[in-house]
Amino acid sequence: MVVVGGGIAGSIAARYAAKNGFKTLLLEKYKTPRNKPCSGIQFQYFEKLIGKKIPREKLCKNELYKIEMITPKDKVMKGKMGMLNFWRSTFDSWLNSLAVEAGVEFNDETSLTDCIQSEDGVIVKISTGNTHKDVKSHYLIGADGMLSTVRRKFRPLDFDRKASGATINYYFVGETNLDPNTLYMFYKKEFCPIMFAWVYLKDDTWVIGTGANQNPLEYADKFFNFVKGKYALRGNIIRREGFSSTLKNTVYLGEGRILMIGDAAGLVDIYRGLGMDNAALSGRLAIKAIAQAEETHSEVTEIYKHLTNNIIMKIEKNAKKQIERYTSDNTLEKSLSPFNMLKGGLLMLLGNQLNRILPSEKLILLPL
């Protein structure tokens, strides 16, 4: 089996493939460890999804356990919730090492250049520097993110010619009145017209970011200047980092002996502002589908579609909710009313309690 992409989805899929007895090759295009413009924040149940407790040294020095939400009308709502806070470079590299320990062959700085599918497998053409070779694989798993080479090969029309927008992070080091243990979420269309804008600390670096479908740099500068003034930032921006994709907002799970997982499959939930849990879960479910297909001689993509049905239904439902809530500042404010927040908080508490007893593949992905 060949897994393309050494991020969360790919590393977990590869590790579980090896644990299920499959000879597995995991490919990562870039030299590892590598930075990714991702929050690196997850709820505690994420450890259950990845199947391992995260060592303390793989997490940031500062813990995040408080949330502060700011509404369009400047109402501030506070809550407490334990979160995992990590740099994706450190975390993904650790997941790579777990895969290797399970028996996976891991090659970074290695790219998939082409793949040809047949009835009994896939010919995967790979390149490492000036070395090129063909690998015959029973299955190919595309876990190569929203710029997926695998998906582009089979579904080129899923990609636009130009990116429709971007997310941008400013990394700031210095003094401030911000609380190091709080995740700040600004639900203000003037700062982010598609979801919330964010501020949080990782070790000694503040991450200040936003996203927009149009003019993302203007939104990023405006939000940073707002945060700088409101919270008395005194220091320097050490790095600016952004990400954009031409992938359309569609789900594609694969065909034949090729399965797509994580962001490459389009399993991104902008309403929740999370994708890592879907990535981890889809990686596990893809291997479960392959194992069942091998045992029953059934069509693997049909099994995989069945296993991921709840994920996809939730993404589609949440996409509609997100469009409705961002119709105007009034609809956004209403969605953040005290009643809705109380209801959401109670559901979060219930979900957390249920996740303690639910099996990994049946976990409730939060927030609801």
Which residue ranges define each predicted feature?
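Beta1/beta-strand and adjacent pyrophosphate-binding region of the FAD-binding site
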Residues: 1-9
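Predominantly flavin-linked oxidoreductase catalytic cores and closely associated redox partners
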Residues: 6, 98-233, 266
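Short loop/edge segments at beta-strand edges and connector loops
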Residues: 93, 108-110, 239-241
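A short alpha-helix-loop-beta-strand transition element characteristic
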Residues: 32-34, 50-66, 159-164, 301
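A conserved beta-strand/loop capping segment in the N-terminal third of enzymes
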Residues: 41-96
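Glycine-rich FAD pyrophosphate-binding loop
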Residues: 6, 16-37
